[in-house]
From Swiss-Prot:
Keywords: Aminopeptidase, Cytoplasm, Hydrolase, Manganese, Metal-binding, Protease. Mn(2+) 1 binds at residues 268, 345, 347. This is Probable cytosol aminopeptidase. It catalyses: Release of an N-terminal amino acid, Xaa-|-Yaa-, in which Xaa is preferably Leu, but may be other amino acids including Pro although not Arg or Lys, and Yaa may be Pro. Amino acid amides and methyl esters are also readily hydrolyzed, but rates on arylamides are exceedingly low; Release of an N-terminal amino acid, preferentially leucine, but not glutamic or aspartic acids. GO terms for cellular component: cytoplasm. Its EC number is 3.4.11.1, 3.4.11.10. Its main location: cytoplasm. The keyword Kinase does not apply. The keyword Phosphoprotein does not apply. Binds 2 manganese ions per subunit. The active site is at 275, 349. It comes from Brucella suis biovar 1 (strain 1330).
Length: 497
């Protein structure tokens, strides 16, 4: 696995050994502190000139070059136009810097720009970007680390910045969020033969060490609760289902909780409506929503969030054996509503139907947000740079959108409406689980909406962003951990004033 760097903050100093990293603005501008760090402004100019480096955001240039103080390598990191930096740009800068440090044991990053003051929270974002970029899932590779291109040791990184106190304090929070993102990535990257519903639940139970109350419901409890929709999906697999309830109580008094629900199909063959063989291996990631909820609960507990939060994940495997549910079957959900199964590959919404109703009925939350790798249709509509956002509450939708813009985990709102709702009406039951080809992500959301009553609710379709999304400066992993930073920001901005 990846070797996570050790990061500290310091006032400006001249690096004594290892790698010196400095920032360069678009057009070649850099601060006096950067020039001092590398032994002279002419070195920065020469490296930039030889490399054709312009200072564009996220671009880098490097040179094996010594300084009088003992530095062996100099790295330039472009920041673009300093006055326009925002959202996740500082994470990109940190990730780009980390990508160039190689096997260095000591790294000094000088965070200074001409006529610009870099705040402590921006420095913390740079550090977070470095931690997230350091992630690598290779636990099943048996080659030696040097053959696999992995650093021999964890780097010790010193970030020099004007406001060290604020940077340290903010990074303490950011590290807890990084822990949550990394947990989500690990869960999604794990192969399905290793991580089934039982094993996933065991991973969630480890959050008890952080003060999270964890309850795991097995098949008997689910039957007693009447979760026919979830159990219908699970009946084709020899691996028993689980429903995991995670509670974090960080607010004073008996404040109503906020709730997050995740789809956790640990492997999705499609069931009897079986998927094509090509790329089916990616369906180990069909629990990306549950992974994000688990990672979020870890982040909230790790930073001692002052909020009461509930995380509920439905864990099943969708397999096509002789006991699997069939197209045409009718199941009764926990809510009492009946569902005709048109397509067994539209299984995630069945799992969520019972998980959403259970969460709403038991906890009476202020709102519910569910995450699910639910439809390929949302990828057709939005590609892999935005997750789909559906909501019955404009205020909640706006808050989520803003959190997405702030973190770079972007959302785009798609419609709901009675016309779409009619498309899931069934001739034989209260509703059907698939309405056909058109508006697939919308009709899936309409289906979920029937299980939340009047509670403010949002559905995030993360099929295009939780796994296999394009790599960026701070994520080179197949699993992105999408949703953890987004929802943590929502909680901080809106519910921890």
């Amino acid at each position: 696995m990846s070797k996570r760097p050790s990061i500290s903050f310091s006032e400006f100093e001249v690096p004594q050994k290892g790698v010196a990293v400095v920032l360069v603005a678009k057009g070649g501008g850099f601060a006096d502190e950067a020039a001092k760090a590398v032994g002279g402004a002419e070195k920065i100019a020469r490296i930039a000139d030889i490399s054709g480096f312009t200072g564009a955001l996220g671009k880098t240039a490097e040179a094996i070059e010594t300084t009088p103080a003992g530095v062996e390598k100099i790295v330039l990191v472009g920041v673009g136009e300093p006055g326009k930096l925002g959202n996740d740009d500082w994470l990109k800068i940190g990730g780009a810097a980390f990508s160039q440090i190689g096997n260095a044991e000591r790294v000094t990053l000088t965070l200074a720009l001409p006529e610009t003051t870099i705040a402590g929270d921006e420095a913390a974002d740079v550090a977070l970007g470095m931690v997230l970029r350091s992630y690598k899932f290779d636990r099943y590779k048996t080659r030696k680390s040097e053959e696999n291109g992995e650093p021999k040791h964890a780097a010790k990184i010193t970030i020099c910045v004007a406001d060290t106190h604020s940077a340290r304090k903010t990074f303490e929070v950011a590290e807890a969020v990084a822990d949550g993102v990394i947990q989500a990535r690990n869960l999604v990257n794990e192969p399905a033969n290793i991580l089934g519903p039982v094993e996933f639940a065991e991973e969630a139970e480890k959050l008890e060490k952080l003060g999270v109350k964890v309850e795991v419901l097995g098949e008997k409890e689910l039957k007693k609760l009447g979760m026919g929709a979830l159990l219908g999906v699970a009946q084709g697999s020899v691996r028993p289902p689980r429903l995991v309830v995670m509670e974090w109580h960080g607010a004073k008094g008996k404040e109503k909780p906020i709730a997050f629900v995740g789809k956790g199909v640990v492997f999705d063959t499609g069931g009897i409506s079986i998927k094509p063989a090509a790329n089916m291996e990616d369906m180990k990631g069909d629990m990306g929503g549950a992974a994000a909820v688990t990672g979020l609960m870890r982040a909230l507990a790790g930073r001692k969030a002052k909020v009461n939060a509930i995380g509920v994940i439905g864990l099943v495997e969708n397999m096509p054996d002789g006991n699997a549910q069939r197209p045409g079957d009718i199941v009764t959900s926990m809510s009492g509503q009946t569902i005709e199964v048109i397509n067994t590959d539209a299984e995630g919404r069945l799992v969520l139907a019972d998980a959403l109703h259970y969460t709403n009925d038991r906890f009476k939350p202020r709102f519910i947000i569910n995450l699910a790798t639910l439809t390929g249709a949302v990828m057709v509509a939005l590609g892999q740079y935005h997750a789909g956002l559906f909501s019955n509450d404009d205020e909640l939708a706006d808050q989520l959108y803003d959190a997405g813009q702030s973190t770079g985990e972007k959302l785009w709102r798609l419609p709901l409406g009675t016309e779409y709702d009619k498309m899931i009406d069934s001739k034989f039951a209260d509703m059907k689980n698939s309405a056909g080809r058109y508006g697939g992500s919308i009709t899936a959301a309409q289906f979920l909406k029937r299980f939340v009553g009047e509670t403010p609710w949002a559905h995030l379709d993360v099929a295009g962003t939780a796994m296999g999304s394009p790599a960026n400066e701070y994520n080179q992993s197949w699993a992105s951990g999408f949703g953890v930073r987004l929802l943590d920001r929502l909680v901080r901005d809106q519910f921890e004033s």
